[in-house]
Amino acid sequence: MDWIGSFGSEDIGVDIGTSNIVLFMKHKGLVFPEASVIARNRMSGEYLAYGTRAEEMEGKTPSEIVISRPMKESAIVDYNGTAFLLNSIVNKSYLKGMFFHPRLIMCVPKGINSVQRRALLEAAVAVGARKTVLIDQPLAAVMGMGLENHQQEGTMIVDIGGGSTKISVLSKKGIVVSHFSTESGSTMDTAVLNTVRDRYHIRIGRKEAESLKIALGASWDLDRQPRIAETSGLSIVSGLPVKIAVTSEDIAGAINPILYKIFTHIRDVLQRTPPALLASIRENGIMMIGGASQLKGMDDLISKVIGVPARVADRPSYVNAVGAGSALNYINDFRDSLQDLH
């Protein structure tokens, strides 16, 4: 792997998620997330906007403009859209007109298949990358949290992202046990949206559903104190704009089944973990990352249900990108886990 020595000032760590894309660049550090959303003209195929700007256009555009997410459940479903998104964000982060060929280190779920690898390579080529390397997300997370020196003791990471949940146990030898599921922040948003529609006969958008999830989700099982948040939508009956008050019990009913599926997956992974690592995990706790890990009281809820201490990492939405950007510092430890695409 002679290419390793060539990495340097133009290394870019990339975490492309279903909800957001985050970059970590050697020359400027963390590049805060842009939404993984694109706007395209249905007739001409021309891309009109990306990121937060495209997301803000959702529900406000004429029928010929399509707003979409090129990633679904942590996999590329729109190659061209992903290439446009990645290319736009990388180039925006450099000086206008600057000619460069970056080297990309991209986070991927454990067990990515050949089709998905090819899709990532095509997206990287569109950016002009002269080298592309894949790193498993759990390993990137360990590096992003600064835990690489403690891996030999056993580390459990629960990554509850926008499109999937990844649960991993790592040791000095790499990933020991892992599990991928489609329960995610996005499925919670859909459940909230459907609950409001069925219970109140109101249609709300995904942004409103996410706001309700953040305001009222997770901590219901800890304090048992009912809470209320207001939201706006369109009445299914009259078609007019209305404002309603939604309760924490409503949100609990919506997202509980999803949370408890995640908890079941955590238990299953613990049951498959070698006994030599379990004591360390129980002592050091479960590390939580991903956007949905930030729901109020989620760490305490997991601690209570699973019986193992859990805590949310600093900047949990960004640790994968930071870890990818610094991966080459630990090349001797993780050489076998880095996949050279070209």
Task: Locate each region found by the language model.
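Nucleotide/phosphate-binding catalytic cleft detector across ATP-hydrolyzing
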Residues: 1-160, 168-286, 293-342
